[in-house]
Amino acid sequence: MSFPSRTRFFDPGSSAGGGEVTLVSMAPNGEVSGLRTALAMGAAKAILVSDPALAGTDALGTAKVLAAAIRRAEPDLILAATESSDGYTGTTPVQIAELLGLPSVTFAKKVEVTGSSVKVERQTEAGYDEVECPLPAVVTVTAGVVEPRYPSFKGIMAAKSKPVENLTVADLGIDAGQVGAAGARQEITDVAPAEARAAGEIVVDEGEGHLRVIEFLEQLKVL
């Protein structure tokens, strides 16, 4: 999740006009350290879904759980990272939008709320698109959407008393058979380290180095 972008965007003292940030996370073993860090950055409260029944949940199952938790918060705008650092599917935010019946905009490099709509500069291979959609909406942001912010000592102390609502699958009204390994439509069959890359070749140019470069490019069928 992109905690800094959310807390910076809705900082009451910022030009964005203020607001309140509610964090929503799904994590094993009641893990709250990441949420506490984000609370220290300025978020008001958090919702944590943690349940042994979630072990083995795939992207769609994760989306179902997070959508149910987000629905409780009744947000005007849902911000998420483009993809997580574990599964890297990049599909969960748009699945959440579909489950909630909301429009979604991905790869946002700039986000601006204007009245009842949100304007987004969406990053593309050729540059960016300007997109506008009504609120509420789901927007996924890229790493450079804001400058990173860090929790202050005052924020760290304040975070200790901010509320974190702990929920289970049953609390969300979700059948345990729809999530976890039992409900997963994807299965990880193997996890293996990437093959080690061979050391590159250093070409010492004594007047004919370009010939070796041409030979190398021909081997790659570039020429």
What are these regions (language model features)?
Residues 1-223:
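N-terminal glycine-rich FAD/FM-binding segment characteristic of electron-transfer flavoproteins
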